Amino acid sequence: MMALAGSCFAADFTDKSADPNAMPEVPAEFEVQLFAGEPLVRQPCSMAFDAKGRLFVGMGPQYRSPKPETPGDSVVMVLDTDGDGQADSTKVFAIGFNAIQGLAWHGRDLWIANAPDLTLVRDLDGDDQADQYVRVYTDLGNLEHGLHGLNWAPDGKLYMSKGNSKGLN
């Protein structure tokens, strides 16, 4: 089991009694260890593995309070370059999103739920950075009840959750 530590929203909780380093309890035949945490991964809101088994994380500084001066949401590759089982670096894969709420790989395409858009990005030249950004659909509502949870199914269709905000009604 892999664990990512972080929060999808920037809240100032006054109750600090919970141990931020505590891991979930699991049966004896399992082990849980932290793979990546802050500051390496900040405000993670979604994650997906590509066909090579690499972890991609959508980070959301825009979540809940988007402002023009706040950096846009991004997708980063989270890397374990020394093979010790813990992430030690990231590489920016795609930038400039408003509110990443879901990631799903399909072939070379990374599909991104990015309120109010559904976007796909591609790395065309193999440098591990997205070169092509395609807005597949827009007007999918706000980030609260908008597009979330992307999953490609065995039937070849992309499934997603969408709440009661405007678009696709």
What is the meaning of each model-derived region?
Residues F9-N169:
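Beta-propeller domains with acidic blade repeats across secreted/periplasmic ectodomains
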